Amino acid sequence: MKNFRDLGGNKTEDGRTVKKGLFYRSAKLSNLSENDIKILRELNIKYIFDYRSDEEARKHPSTIISNIKNIRIPAMRELEESGGSFGSIEDMIDRLFEKDGAFNMLNNSYYNLPINNPSYKKLVELIRDYSNLPILNHCTAGKDRTGVGSAIILMILGVAAVERKELGILQFR
């Protein structure tokens, strides 16, 4: 499993430590080895939460593991609804060549990603119930969308911003 790690062990702002073995993140879970499946079973993962688009899931279907519930709600819903792009090529090129265009496009998409997002809303609903844990959240590379989901989990648990930064997870103002 690529980019697999436990979110536990991080210090909260009030000095406690996030319990290990409850929240995991990774890249896509297609073509898992028997050993990977064994590890997920031994970790007692109850839910696998997938942020990938329909197209990504079609190209690289997740390995189905019995007794682990799978939920897939695309996190990039605007991208999915627009057919997988940030508007027309012409519009995108125009925006890229504006002053700080590429930075602004990327920053705005990540900044707005968790706002009113059904995917992250469902993630929060799941983690509120301890009986749903442990949970593994993932996207294709296990970085951006998964990073946002992991940051949300850690923020809810009270992990300091500096700790989130050390994990390589996006910070929002």
What are these regions (language model features)?
Residues 1-136, 149-173:
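Cys-dependent protein tyrosine phosphatase-like superfamily
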Residues 140-141, 145-146:
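Ser/Thr-glycine-rich phosphate-binding loops at phosphate-binding pockets of nucleotides
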